[in-house]
UniProtKB/Swiss-Prot annotation:
Source organism: Microtus socialis
InterPro entries: Cyt_b/b6_C, Cyt_b/b6_C_sf, Cyt_b/b6_N, Cytb/b6-like_sf, Cytochrome_b, Cytochrome_b_C_euk/bac, Cytochrome_b_N_euk/bac, Di-haem_cyt_TM
Effect of residue 118 to I: In strain: Isolate 3
Its biological purpose: Component of the ubiquinol-cytochrome c reductase complex (complex III or cytochrome b-c1 complex) that is part of the mitochondrial respiratory chain. The b-c1 complex mediates electron transfer from ubiquinol to cytochrome c. Contributes to the generation of a proton gradient across the mitochondrial membrane that is then used for ATP synthesis.
Listed SUPFAM superfamilies: a domain/subunit of cytochrome bc1 complex (Ubiquinol-cytochrome c reductase), Transmembrane di-heme cytochromes
Name of the protein this chain belongs to: Cytochrome b
Binding-site positions, a ubiquinone: 201
Necessary cofactors: heme b
A cellular component annotation (GO) from this entry: respiratory chain complex III
Record-listed heme b b566 binding positions: 97, 196
Membrane topology: Multi-pass membrane protein
Note on cofactor: Binds 2 heme b groups non-covalently.
Length: 380
């Protein structure tokens, strides 16, 4: 078996990636989220495939087909809720994975980090288009509002929006193409994940100290396969509790009303995992400015390696920057809350303050804290 594992051209790749891979001996449970994201992607592709067998991407029948899946298809309700809540679990793991990367300075592996940002954009695009497919009120109006943001692009904006819509409003053509893209994107994401892993295995994993761990490596299997499996069990348990006991807790009640272009919901808002970006978008009174801030809220991650001023890689031994980091986490939670609130006092001013704080912490305060720590630790 050992000979096949090490000699067979295909199994050899798997062996070098998941079995005989040299891994740092001290990586914590924060390093579990990569494998959990892989599991989430598999769950989403499988449940999505079964949903696609019964779904029809036509404005006249889309809502009814989802109802049919829940009522008439064997375990259709389970597949539908697994897919909907699987997206939430996916984003929880994604945010924790990115947060881990920022905390431990993993962004210094630039190729891996940038590939991760591309993956984040791809997953966000997939989730947005998936939310449109049930063709409920929030599906329709969410699609209308978010695609309309492109009209802020000077000169070509309006033409671009109508080109994406396939007409003069969100209609049958829009739904059909969103379904096509929503179906193909997870497979593109799978390919990007392999590239992400390829880049990661060029440098090897980071570790909680941020120090070089070449002198102390252990094989990935059995140590981290067992450790990852525990993470998988915890995730699946949380996932099934969410899906079976609280399936609608993260959804919007408006999406149980069929799409009606003549009736606007009182509060148009995206799914919870986009609320932080939506709050940043809304905090700027100018349309183009809001769109740029929205994009920048994610793109700013690509500048993390340039903004790294500390002589140390991780935040493990840097209490001042640690404080900034946890304020940033709290700020993101505030933005998420504000994104779900109506546009009125005091939510407007809270959202604007939190948006300014978000960019200030990342661009100014954390780099300054890094330089200050170098100074007081005499690391210059």
């Amino acid at each position: 078996m050992t000979i096949i594992r090490k000699k067979h051209p295909l199994i050899k790749i798997i062996n070098h990636s998941f079995i005989d891979l040299p891994a740092p001996s001290n990586i914590s449970s924060w390093w579990n989220f990569g494998s959990l994201l892989g599991l989430c992607l598999i769950i989403q592709i499988l449940t999505g495939l079964f949903l696609a067998m019964h779904y029809t991407s036509d404005t006249a029948t889309a809502f009814s087909s989802v109802t049919h899946i829940c009522r008439d298809v064997n375990y259709g309700w389970l597949i539908r809720y697994m897919h909907a809540n699987g997206a939430s679990m996916f984003f929880i793991c994604l945010f924790l994975h990115v947060g881990r990367g920022i905390y431990y300075g993993s962004y210094n592996m630039i190729e891996t980090w940038n590939m991760g940002i591309v993956l984040l954009f791809a997953v966000m695009a997939t989730a947005f288009m998936g939310y449109v497919l049930p063709w409920g009120q929030m599906s329709f109006w969410g699609a209308t509002v978010i695609t309309n943001l492109l009209s802020a692009i000077p000169y070509i904006g309006t033409t671009l929006v109508e080109w994406i819509w396939g007409g003069f409003s969100v209609d049958k053509a829009t739904l059909t193409r969103f379904f096509a893209f929503h179906f193909i994107l997870p497979f593109i994401i799978t390919a990007l994940v392999l590239v992400h892993l390829l880049f990661l295995h060029e440098t090897g994993s980071n570790n909680p100290t941020g120090l070089n761990s070449d002198a102390d490596k252990i094989p990935f299997h059995p140590y981290y396969t067992i450790k990852d499996f525990l993470g998988v069990l915890i995730l699946l348990m949380a996932f099934m509790i969410l899906t079976l006991f609280f399936p609608d807790i993260l959804g919007d009640p408006d999406n149980y009303t069929p799409a009606n272009p003549l009736n606007t919901p009182p509060h148009i808002k995206p799914e919870w995992y986009f609320l932080f970006a939506y709050a940043i978008l809304r905090s700027i009174p100018n349309k183009l400015g809001g769109v740029l801030a929205l994009i920048l809220s994610i793109v700013i991650l690509a500048f993390m390696p340039l903004l790294h001023t500390s002589k140390q890689r991780a935040l493990t031994f840097r209490p001042i920057t640690q404080t900034m980091y946890w304020i940033l986490v709290a700020d993101l939670l505030i933005l998420t809350w504000i994104g779900g609130q109506p546009v009125e006092y005091p939510f407007i001013i809270i959202g604007q303050t939190a948006s300014i704080a978000y960019f200030t912490i990342i661009v100014i305060l954390m780099p300054m804290a890094g330089m200050f720590e170098n100074n007081i630790l005499d690391l210059d």
